[in-house]
Curated annotation (Swiss-Prot):
GO terms for molecular function: ATP binding; metal ion binding; ribosomal S6-glutamic acid ligase activity. Mg(2+) 2 binds at residues 260, 262. This is Ribosomal protein bS6--L-glutamate ligase. ATP binds at residues 141, 178-179, 187, 211-213. The lineage of its organism: Bacteria, Pseudomonadati, Pseudomonadota, Gammaproteobacteria, Enterobacterales. Binds 2 magnesium or manganese ions per subunit. Its cofactor is Mg(2+); Mn(2+). It comes from Shigella boydii serotype 4 (strain Sb227).
Length: 300
């Protein structure tokens, strides 16, 4: 097969591993910067051009689209979909997962347990907002934040009011969430491919922090997950219609709680921690579906 990887930086670990895994299985691979793709949207002869040339047909596309370029990145991916390329995560699913509010609404609708969460743009009554989510301590986040950026733990009511008021001055959407103290700065990242959790790690925050993101200096170890956690991770990925997803789970006293569903999970931390060839599993998923179900679905 001919496979395109959409990424702004082909030197990143995940891109290199996906390229390597695809080549090892006999496929042709090209890494394309989605921002350098430009599209001819024409009912008679749609096409995609890249750095002065018309791109050939690709059997499959692997989107590694960063949050900052979601709008144009998913537009480029849609064009590949229009031309019959199988996407490892469809554009609509990526856009849905990037909308944190919509994601949580969809997960809640499916009965998937979440931390108690409030979202607001410009709260007129900060005190009522804090009461609504159960009071301090609580976590205040910018909806548009990623990798732990724009996330603050407010341990007292006064601190929570100050943080919310400060964020309100940024004219941003604010997410206010209960703090799961018993998780002790740890979460579980489940890597879902299709209908299987192929790997899981526990991420622990560095000392003095509560954010377990590896990009923020957190540490990782292999996690043994329960059948309930496995089921919830798969259900969360299905709810978001993602073939590949990183599902982040907190272990609370009342049971596992889904924190986030990531449409473009990094492979470095989880592959190096577990030793599992996740990139290879993603390529095998493409082999299974790019040549059968998707062609039937799109008429390709």
């Amino acid at each position: 097969m001919k496979i395109a990887i959409l990424s702004r930086d082909g030197t990143l670990y995940s891109c290199k591993r996906l390229r390597e895994a695809a080549i090892q299985r006999g496929h042709l691979v090209e890494i394309l910067d989605p921002l350098s793709c430009y599209m001819n949207i024409n009912p008679a002869a749609s096409s995609i051009h890249y750095k002065g040339r018309k791109l050939p047909h690709f059997d499959a596309v692997i989107p590694r689209i960063g949050t900052a370029i979601t709008f144009y990145g998913t537009a480029a991916l849609r064009q590949f979909e229009m031309l019959g390329s199988y996407p490892l995560n469809e554009s609509v699913a990526i856009a849905r997962a990037r909308d944190k509010l919509r994601s949580m609404q969809l997960l809640a609708r499916q009965g998937i347990d979440l931390p108690v969460t409030g979202i607001v743009h410009s709260p007129d009554d900060t005190s009522d907002l804090i009461d609504m989510v159960g009071g301090a301590p609580l976590v205040v986040k910018l909806v548009e934040g990623t990798q732990g950026i724009g996330v603050v733990l407010a341990e007292t009511r006064q601190a929570a009011e100050s943080v919310i008021d400060a964020f309100r001055g940024l004219n941003a959407h604010i997410l206010v969430q209960e703090y799961i103290k018993e998780a002790q700065g740890c979460d579980i990242r489940c890597l879902v491919v299709g209908d299987e959790v192929v790997a899981a790690i526990e991420r622990r925050a560095k000392e003095g922090d509560f954010r377990s993101n590896l990009h923020r200096g957190g540490a990782a170890s292999v996690a043994s997950i329960t059948p309930q956690e496995r089921e919830i991770a798969i259900k969360a990925a299905r709810t978001m219609a993602l073939d590949v997803a990183g599902v982040d789970i907190l272990r609370a006293n009342r049971g596992p709680l889904v924190m986030e569903v990531n449409a473009s999970p990094g492979l470095e931390g989880i592959e190096k921690t577990t030793g599992i060839d996740i990139a290879g599993k993603m390529i095998r998923w493409i082999e299974r579906y790019a040549t059968t179900e998707y062609c039937l679905k799109t008429g390709g």
